[in-house]
Amino acid sequence: MAQAPHIHRTRYAKCGDMDIAYQVLGDGPTDLLVLPGPFVPIDSIDDEPSLYRFHRRLASFSRVIRLDHRGVGLSSRLAAITTLGPKFWAQDAIAVMDAVGCEQATIFAPSFHAMNGLVLAADYPERVRSLIVVNGSARPLWAPDYPVGAQVRRADPFLTVALEPDAVERGFDVLSIVAPTVAGDDVFRAWWDLAGNRAGPPSIARAVSKVIAEADVRDVLGHIEAPTLILHRVGSTYIPVGHGRYLAEHIAGSRLVELPGTDTLYWVGDTGPMLDEIEEFITGVRGGADAERMLATIMFTDIVGSTQHAAALGDDRWRDLLDNHDTIVCHEIQRFGGREVNTAGDGFVATFTSPSAAIACADDIVDAVAALGIEVRIGIHAGEVEVRDASHGTDVAGVAVHIGARVCALAGPSEVLVSSTVRDIVAGSRHRFAERGEQELKGVPGRWRLCVLMRDDATRTR
């Protein structure tokens, strides 16, 4: 495998006269719209390992949609500050959802940009499946009826000196406040500075920070109907946990989970408990340490031209053909010691302990189903997977599974296509392969070398 830098294609959605930059990764059954972090544009996310891993975990169970809101990063700059703020940033999010064909999404709303998510859930209830607020607030500053907010005199340095390039030299280190566990990491600090520069010049940072500091969206909380998960680190001093408790008290049916930690930046520190809560909230299944991990060879099969076959045969004859296909494939999987873990449309997903067994099984399946007048495409990859139901082995998940599915999608009729990982493991065996070259796999970082099984020269096991 030739691994390239982690690059996701940036596209643009139109929001009035604004161009809103966005990226998509993963292809899970649920859309997860990740609102921007604090002055971290989307083209900087994958350059920071902890943030990259956090988003990859999200993409293992959802389709992640992330964006730069207007005024920041790759999105359009503004002529006037009057078009900044939670209401306008919510419009940016809707424009991106429309551009990617997302009718409804779970909204991931971190820190002070949580206010955008709160407005989005209240103003566009039909577009919000659920809401996740992380270290967020409905208002940053103190008010007589909001004592958990920061006093203006304490907030002022964050709106002035903190936004200047020489802030640390002038004695104000914002990173030590928002992410104390990585404040001493020179590599992280260099990335943080570069991300801030990419986000925009100090004038943009001052304008955005001023709008956020003056925002107050408490009036929308009573209108939020979507299921809401509120996650807040109890040791955060930048956005104290009192903000999260206020949200929980004022959003009907919401659930507050107080997590250990001092970092306001959601992707640093101990992220395991946070990610487990998010995955369980979205999927109903808690991943992480509660899921059994194992090394496996994953095989995907798919009937070529199934829609055309179904139209030509009619429902009854097509159903009979599918039954015969399923019987044949199940028999071959069992014969080679595999385990069926899921069905995928008109195909199967199976795991094997041996890559050679998976290849031999795939080889036989191609020939066996040909007697039915159909062809299949098969993709095989090997890697670590999560067993979702460890006691029964009923399903598997993880990046390796996504790779297997993508390899299968690139296979031609009656082809067995494998990743170079599989080819390298079985080097020296009777199986021979032809190079297919490096390919991009949708939702998977880097470029992957693929190989096709040379079936005509293979030694058959029958």
UniProtKB/Swiss-Prot annotation:
A Pfam family recorded for this sequence: Guanylate_cyc
One of the GO BP terms on file: cAMP biosynthetic process
Gene3D superfamilies, per database record: alpha/beta hydrolase, Nucleotide cyclase
Record note on what altering residue 343 to A does: Does not substantially affect adenylate cyclase activity
Documented EC number(s): 3.1.1.-, 4.6.1.1
GO function terms (MF aspect): adenylate cyclase activity; hydrolase activity; manganese ion binding; protein homodimerization activity
Annotated phenotype, changing residue 302 to A: Loss of adenylate cyclase activity
Phenotypic consequence of residue 377 to A: Does not substantially affect adenylate cyclase activity
pH dependence: Optimum pH is 9.0 for lipolytic activity of the full-length protein.
Residues bound to ATP: 305-306, 308, 346, 442
Conditions for induction: Expression is up-regulated in acidic, nutritive and iron stress in M.tuberculosis H37Ra.
Cofactor comment: Cannot use Mg(2+) as a cofactor.
Known regulation of activity: The lipolytic activity of the full-length protein is regulated/inhibited by the presence of the C-terminal adenylate cyclase domain. Lipolytic activity of the full-length protein decreases in the presence of ATP, but ATP does not affect activity of the N-terminal domain in the absence of the C-terminal cyclase domain. Lipolytic activity is inhibited by the serine modifier phenylmethylsulfonyl fluoride (PMSF).
Functional note: May play a role in cell wall modulation. The N-terminal domain exhibits lipolytic activity. In vitro, hydrolyzes various p-nitrophenyl (pNP) esters. pNP-decanoate (C10) is the best substrate, followed by pNP-octonate (C8), pNP-laurate (C12) and pNP-butyrate (C4). Exhibits lower activity with pNP-acetate (C2), pNP-myristate (C14) and pNP-palmitate (C16). Can also use tributyrin. The C-terminal domain catalyzes the biosynthesis of cyclic AMP (cAMP) from ATP. It has a guanylyl cyclase side-activity, corresponding to 7% of the adenylate cyclase activity.
Other facts noted in the record for this chain: Expression in M.smegmatis leads to altered colony morphology, growth, cell surface properties and cell wall permeability. M.smegmatis shows enhanced biofilm formation and survival under lysozyme, acidic, nutritive and antibiotic stress conditions. It also enhances the infection capability and the intracellular survival of mycobacteria.
Protein name as catalogued: Bifunctional lipase/adenylate cyclase LipJ
